[in-house]
Curated annotation (Swiss-Prot):
The chain crosses the membrane at residues 15-35. Coiled coil: none annotated. It is found in: Membrane. A motif (GDS motif) lies at residues 153-155. The keyword Phosphoprotein does not apply. May act as a bridging protein that binds pectin and other cell wall polysaccharides. Probably involved in maintaining esterification of pectins. May be involved in the specific O-acetylation of cell wall polymers. Keywords: Membrane, Signal-anchor, Transmembrane, Transmembrane helix. The keyword Metal-binding does not apply. GO terms for cellular component: membrane. GO terms for molecular function: O-acetyltransferase activity. This is Protein trichome birefringence-like 24. It comes from Arabidopsis thaliana. A motif (DCXHWCLPGXXDXWN motif) lies at residues 406-420. PANTHER family: PROTEIN TRICHOME BIREFRINGENCE-LIKE 24, PROTEIN TRICHOME BIREFRINGENCE-LIKE 9-RELATED. The gene is TBL24.
Length: 430
């Protein structure tokens, strides 16, 4: 009887041992399967062509319902972050016109100004070949601790810096620490992270004498020195860890051109028939040649320099001073819209000069100079402009009032915020 009990006890122990070994083996193969499955995702690195490969790092915070903050550090896949489409998004912006009203220029605060439709806020940018994580303000601030940023250019650069400040203000309020006499150049500080963000006004990037009022009305042609860079920004470049530089639309203004301290021609200067008409494309090409050479020289900056392509406007039935309007309320597809000839000329010059500078001045990899080609991305958002709501509640007194339309700048919040999603991804994974 004792022998039988002993035998049963041994058999019971063997069964338990077999179950334990089986559980260990099942866990091991399940883990292997998980690892193999994970390898289907991919890492991302920046290239001078504007195309990127994606490595998604773990987010510092998770926004509710934010399916785009995905696990990262996985495998590499090539992805052009600038080629994609706008898709519906139920989440919307991370800030509002009220929460960031003090930082938004009044002309771009469309909702406060009375814009009645809000559907334009509920679209997000989706690259064709990969997922783009949403902008994570906490993560950005942590990455940029003790760093300095600069946005250099015209009023679109101001539009851009205000977008970034609003997104970051959801974590920490910036403190304005400097402005020039005309409030065109400003600097902010995030004291908890020791991050400095500057906006430097230099609409041509080269030296220019400008004669116009705050509404853009000129009293004389611009005097433009195509071969002299504006020291307002060049003198500060060594102090910036990151800079985003852009220009474009100001070159369409009437201007007198100078090179080597000599008058060489003009654009749209019919009142001076003795001066040769060279066209804005001549001036833009000559100016950007010098700008790109400066940016590509590593001795001129200590950090990463992004050149952002010019942004398209969406004026219809006229332009800024001739009654142009923009009444669209949703995005369009690439097939539904064509780039205007003038925008194509600007864009082609920008790309050509960028590639030339990379080819001639760097080791073919661009060095610290990178390209942000947002032209097509923004071309498909004709609904993102202030339009009639550039001024505060323009139709309160007269529903038929004639108002200045703004189809050049961008509503905040709005589609312009998604530029920051792309920029953060290129920085994190570049």
């Amino acid at each position: 009887m004792k022998l039988k009990l002993s035998s049963i006890s041994m058999n019971h122990k063997n069964v338990l041992l077999i179950k334990l070994i089986s559980a260990i083996l099942i866990s091991f193969f399940a883990f292997r399967l998980f690892i193999l499955h994970s390898s289907e995702f991919s890492p991302i690195f920046a290239s001078v062509t504007g195309k990127f490969e994606a490595r998604f790092l773990p987010p510092e915070i998770i926004v509710p319902e934010n399916e785009d903050l995905i696990p990262q550090d996985i495998e590499v896949e090539k992805c052009d972050l600038f080629a994609g489409k706008w898709i519906p998004d139920s989440v919307g912006p991370i800030y509002t016109n009220k929460s960031c009203g003090s930082l938004i220029d009044g002309h771009q605060n469309c909702i406060t100004n009375g814009r009645p439709d809000l559907d334009f806020l509920y679209w997000k940018w989706k690259p064709h070949d990969c997922l783009l994580p949403r902008f994570d303000p906490r993560r950005f601030l942590q990455l940029m601790r003790h760093k300095s940023w600069a946005f250099i250019g015209d009023s679109i650069s101001r539009n851009h810096v205000e977008s970034l400040l609003c997104m970051l203000s959801t974590i920490e309020e910036p403190v304005e620490v400097y402005h020039d006499m005309e409030y065109k150049s400003k600097r902010w500080h995030f004291p908890l992270h020791n991050l400095t963000v500057s906006n430097i006004w230099s609409p041509f990037l080269v030296q220019a004498a400008i004669f116009e009022d705050s509404n853009g009305v000129s009293t004389a042609s611009v005097q433009l020195h195509l071969d002299r860079l504006d020291e307002t920004w060049t003198s500060l470049m060594p102090s910036f860890d990151y800079a985003i530089i852009s220009t474009g639309k100001w070159f369409l203004k009437s201007a007198i051109y100078h090179e080597n301290a000599k008058l060489v021609g003009c654009h749209n200067c019919q009142e001076k028939p003795h001066i040769e008409e060279l066209g804005f494309d001549y001036a833009y090409n000559a100016s950007l040649h010098n700008v790109m050479d400066f940016l590509a020289a590593e001795d001129n900056s200590k950090g990463t320099v992004f050149f952002r392509t010019s942004t398209p406007d969406h004026f219809q039935n006229g332009e800024w001073h001739s009654g142009g309007t923009c009444k669209q309320t949703e995005p369009v597809s690439d097939e539904e819209i064509e780039i205007k000839d003038v925008h194509k000329i600007l864009k082609d010059i920008e790309i050509d000069q960028f590639k030339r500078a990379v080819r001639e001045k760097t080791n073919q990899d661009g060095g610290n100079l990178k390209l942000l080609d947002f032209t097509r991305m923004l071309l498909t958002r004709p609904d993102g402009h202030p339009g009639e709501y550039r001024q505060f509640r323009p139709f309160d007194k007269d529903k038929n009032a004639k108002v200045q339309n703004d189809c050049l700048h961008w509503c905040l919040p709005g589609p312009f915020d998604y530029l920051n999603d792309v920029i953060l991804e290129t920085i994190v994974n570049g």
